[in-house]
Amino acid sequence: MDTTKQNVKTLKNFINGKWVDAKTETFENVYNPATGDVLARVPHSTSEDVADAVTAAKEAFKIWQKVSIPKRAKILFKYQQLLVEHQEELGRIVTEENGKSLDEAVAEVGRGIENVEFAAGVPTLMMGDSLSSVATDVEATNYRYPIGVVGGITPFNFPMMVPCWMFPMAVATGNTFILKPSEKTPLTSQRLVELFQEAGLPDGVLNIVNGAVDVVNGILDHPDIKAISFVGSERVGEYVYKRGSDHLKRVQALTGAKNHTIVLADADLDAAVKGIISSSFGSAGERCMATSVLVLQDEIADKFMAKFTQAAKDIKIGNGLDKGVFLGPVIRKENQERTLNYIQTGVKEGAKLVLDGSAEAKKHDGYFVGPTIFEDVKTDMTIWHDEMFAPVLSVIRAKDLPQAVAIANTSELANGACLFTDSAASIRYFRENIDAGMLGINLGVPAPIAVFPFSGWKHSFFGTLHANGKDSVDFYTHKKVVTARYDQRRFK
């Protein structure tokens, strides 16, 4: 960690509508991972900073919860318009601090905007239910209400999209929000809050507290924070879930992944190659929906691998701002070194290294690893088991679909799985027997749109209610059921 002052911008926290200095003397650098250049310094804020944000959010909640739902929706609509106008700008910020290609970054911004659009439909989403006759002259009505101050802890890999899974719906449903963005990619969130303020969001409704573990613990422990949304690693997600639950908070923790993609003999191999190249190596493999294990049916494995390996070799690697670049860097030097160690481990444990991306580490100033492909991988190998979060693909062969599904189901991480096939019967078998929450058929990244939940299984999710879709409305609201008798005897 770099705690020295440099001639770069020092980021502030956003509390009660103002940019304020963190109460800390500890900072770390925000890097452009493609160049190693320092973009800014981010503070390691303290639990005192969290408390200040909670105080502001708690006061703002008293007023915000009373704002009419259509008026809140109008602010969301204005916010959506501003995000569309600034989509290219936001994409460049994402690329500069995260490293992914500009095309991917702009597309990510688009996915975030979709979540804002969904949240803007809050008048319909907040509607309750009623039954006019539960007994003689008695009716019952169910109403939704916001729960209060809520928090969000977001990862580095989608600095635009993941925060937009959280705060737009949270504030649309009447809550106030405290966001802790990743200390590796905090710049996008700064611009997001500026644009929301421009859209007319009142002071204190959305707050940002930058930092690391002290901020996480401050959010988890504060008694006035009622719910916490988290996206990140399995290890940290389990910690967040347990500690937050110990403090009687609602917690949704979306965590690690080891996604398997199966290609059967009847698949369109060219389409499968294209989809899996994007899934495995897009965003440098640093996404929880990446294909990290490829299971090939024996009879087409050699033919597929010839096509796939050549396509991987043709990938353009470099700074995501450069035209035509597909694969950018991993996020930090330590992530690069960790990935290189995994490649060495795979070789030592007996996997066949078909394509080695290690050489890219020496060709660039940033933190690059090229596309890497292993064959002859076994399910007891480290590279099969661990979530590497890198452009490294493990390939396994299977005689048929049941064996391929059995291999995938061995993993304790079950965010998603994909199948390439032309068989309706195979699709049904896959759907009914695979143990994963998000399934792709003839596509490589089965991340759902905003109206459906992001529904990981097993150790890929801790909690009850998922992010996105109707689950997010349920997560950020609680209900009152009013049962009323209206005596009708006077009219008889």
UniProtKB/Swiss-Prot annotation:
Chain positions recorded as NAD(+) binding sites: F156, K180, E183, K184, S233, T255, E387
Class of this enzyme: oxidoreductase
Single GO BP term: thymine catabolic process
Pathways per UniProt: Polyol metabolism; myo-inositol degradation into acetyl-CoA; acetyl-CoA from myo-inositol: step 7/7
Xref: SUPFAM superfamilies: ALDH-like
The keyword ATP-binding appears for this protein: no
Active site: C288
InterPro entries (UniProt xref): Ald_DH/histidinol_DH, Ald_DH_C, Ald_DH_CS_CYS, Ald_DH_N, Aldehyde_DH_dom, MeMal-semiAld_DH, MSDH_GmP_bac
Catalytic activity: 3-oxopropanoate + NAD(+) + CoA + H2O = hydrogencarbonate + acetyl-CoA + NADH + H(+); 2-methyl-3-oxopropanoate + NAD(+) + CoA + H2O = propanoyl-CoA + hydrogencarbonate + NADH + H(+)
Stored NCBIfam families: MMSDH (TIGR01722)
Family in the record: Belongs to the aldehyde dehydrogenase family. IolA subfamily.
Assembly notes: Homotetramer.
Functional note: Catalyzes the oxidation of malonate semialdehyde (MSA) and methylmalonate semialdehyde (MMSA) into acetyl-CoA and propanoyl-CoA, respectively. Is involved in a myo-inositol catabolic pathway. Bicarbonate, and not CO2, is the end-product of the enzymatic reaction.
Name of the protein in question: Malonate-semialdehyde dehydrogenase
Taxonomic source organism: Lacticaseibacillus casei (Lactobacillus casei)
UniProt lineage: Bacteria, Bacillati, Bacillota, Bacilli, Lactobacillales
Gene name as annotated: iolA
